[in-house]
Regions:
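Linker/hinge segments immediately adjacent to helix-turn-helix/homeobox DNA-binding domains
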Residues: 19-35, 79
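Core residues of bacterial helix-turn-helix
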Residues: 70, 119-120, 131
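Short hydrophobic/aromatic patch on the recognition helix
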Residues: 76-81, 126-127, 131
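Helix-turn-helix
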Residues: 65-74, 78
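Short, Lys/Arg-enriched anionic-surface-contact patches
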Residues: 37-44, 87-93
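Short, solvent-exposed positions on alpha-helices
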Residues: 8-16
Length: 146
């Protein structure tokens, strides 16, 4: 009789543990799905912000403006951006600006200063240094290439 009570108790205990396990697993699945949904929404938001920034590359983009668009603090914004795109917003922006500048210098007869302004660089000396560092020659030298 004592053994019977222990077996009944064990089955009840096992059943309770199994129920608890199922409840915990169910909650975990729901929170994971919600997390994926919010990650997906956040990724979509960042894709829109990135598209806006890269489409309007000639405009001055500040960290504050980008953070406000995402409604995030600076560190959160940069962390998310890096996770989604494996880069920083300013690196993406400057890379696109540089490609546009190389294209304009190669295909248009424009002064270097005008190319810099058209590509969103407000400072000619910064543009020239950045261009030389990344292309191995000055913008003027690039424009004279055959």
């Amino acid at each position: 009789s004592d053994v019977y009570k222990r077996q009944v108790f064990s089955r009840d205990y096992e059943y309770a543990l199994l129920c608890q396990l199922m409840i915990t697993a169910s909650r975990e699945l729901r929170s994971t799905d919600t997390g994926k949904s919010s990650d997906s929404e956040l990724c979509s938001l960042f894709q829109k912000i990135r598209l806006e920034m890269l489409t309007n590359y000639e405009k001055p983009w500040t960290t504050e403006k980008l953070c406000a668009m995402a409604n995030l603090e600076k560190s959160q914004f940069y962390s998310c951006y890096r996770n989604f795109f494996d880069s920083t917003p300013h690196a993406d922006l400057n890379l696109l600006r540089l490609e546009k500048a190389k294209n304009l210098l190669t295909n248009e007869a424009l002064p270097v200063q005008q190319v810099a302004l058209l590509c969103g660089f407000s400072n000619l000396s910064h543009f020239s240094r950045y261009f030389r560092k990344n292309c191995g020659c000055s913008p003027s030298e690039w424009a004279r290439r055959p």
